[in-house]
């Protein structure tokens, strides 16, 4: 695990296109803002270029301050295009139906966005389906716009596929109603268990007038190849490091038994395989926590108590003791030295 640093995540620089367009629609030039964060036009032209989630959140927050619009995330979603999601988005644009477009955006999400906290999902039942975005709590001025832009962006993108408006039956958002709550659709509920939008079967069944079967199949093959390349895992330790991300939350640390259950193998088998790789579950857990803690402290404004909660520590004090053991300095000292 020491050679495989755990990161918060990253996303395609294509997402900057909709952010810039939203800023421009408010009468502001986005170029100085993007240059301030190292996003020169030449960087945005690079195929496959990615942007760290922490930097994206800082840019989004700065854009909100620049425009004076706390609901800017909703506007970002409204101007979102499928092409901004790269190969996955272009493939979704060729899907035969809205349903298949939604499934494509979800299945191939790692091609344009990755976060250790989890992955988006699609849940269909007899009455319709939910497109669900994973939790990125705790919420603040730096990340609420991410939820806003993504859910609103999904609706915009699926409407493009259908060639007509695709409305959500219900919009559910995890964080409490913000000051700009009046800017959301009337059917929005806050303080919910998930970030998700509800689509009817009638909308999911809408056909894509631009669908070409052969092009669709070719693009799907390319997506599968790229997904396999991006998600290829060399060791069991790396696989466990990925699983720990979504499990590290809520003020409690995940156990070997929980991880073994996720892998669908007995705990003793997992322990034996890790020994064969020359590592232990506790070492992987500590390395994962250390890497994430360093990134949170360096790249975000989260309080140490919030970081402790996200990394499964029972208290801020327990987290600070562990961090000093790992890095020989306190979290406060680490943040100060990294920002000088």
Regions found by a protein language model. Give the residues of each.
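N-terminal low-complexity or simple alpha-helical regulatory segments
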Residues: 1-128
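Hydrophobic alpha-helical core bundles mediating ligand binding, dimerization, or RNAP-core interactions
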Residues: 60, 151-154, 223
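Short hinge/gating elements
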Residues: 86-92, 136-140, 223-227
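Internal, well-ordered alpha-helical segments in soluble enzyme and binding-protein domains
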Residues: 101, 150-153, 215
């Amino acid at each position: 695990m020491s050679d495989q640093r755990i990161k918060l995540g990253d996303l395609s620089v294509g997402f900057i296109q909709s952010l810039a367009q939203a800023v421009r629609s408010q009468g502001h030039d986005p170029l100085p803002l993007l240059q301030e964060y190292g996003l020169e036009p030449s960087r945005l032209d690079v195929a496959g270029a990615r942007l760290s989630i922490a930097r994206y959140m800082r840019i989004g927050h700065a854009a909100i301050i620049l425009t004076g619009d706390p609901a800017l995330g909703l506007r970002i979603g409204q101007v979102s295009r499928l092409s901004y999601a790269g190969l996955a988005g272009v493939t979704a644009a060729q899907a035969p139906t809205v349903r298949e477009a939604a499934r494509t955006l979800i299945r191939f999400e790692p091609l344009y966005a990755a976060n250790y906290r989890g992955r988006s999902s699609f849940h269909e039942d007899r009455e319709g389906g939910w497109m669900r975005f994973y939790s990125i709590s705790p919420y603040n001025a730096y990340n609420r716009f991410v939820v806003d832009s993504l859910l609103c962006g999904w609706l915009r993108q699926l409407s493009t596929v259908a060639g007509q408006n695709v409305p959500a039956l219900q919009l559910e958002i995890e964080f409490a109603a913000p000051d700009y709550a009046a800017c959301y659709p009337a059917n929005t509920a806050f303080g919910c268990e998930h970030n998700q939008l509800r689509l009817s079967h009638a909308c999911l069944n809408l056909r894509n007038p631009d669908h070409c079967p052969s092009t669709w199949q070719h693009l799907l093959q390319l997506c599968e190849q790229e997904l396999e390349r991006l998600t290829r895992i060399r060791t069991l330790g790396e696989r466990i490091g990925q699983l720990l991300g979504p499990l590290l939350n809520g003020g409690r640390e995940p156990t070997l038994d929980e991880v073994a259950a996720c892998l669908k193998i007995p705990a003793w088998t997992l322990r034996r395989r890790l020994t064969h790789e020359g590592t232990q579950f506790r070492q992987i857990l500590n390395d994962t926590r250390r890497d994430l803690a360093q990134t949170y402290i360096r790249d975000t404004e989260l309080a140490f108590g919030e970081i402790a909660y996200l990394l499964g520590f029972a208290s801020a004090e327990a987290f600070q003791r562990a961090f000093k053991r790992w890095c020989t300095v306190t979290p406060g000292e680490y943040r100060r030295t990294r920002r000088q």
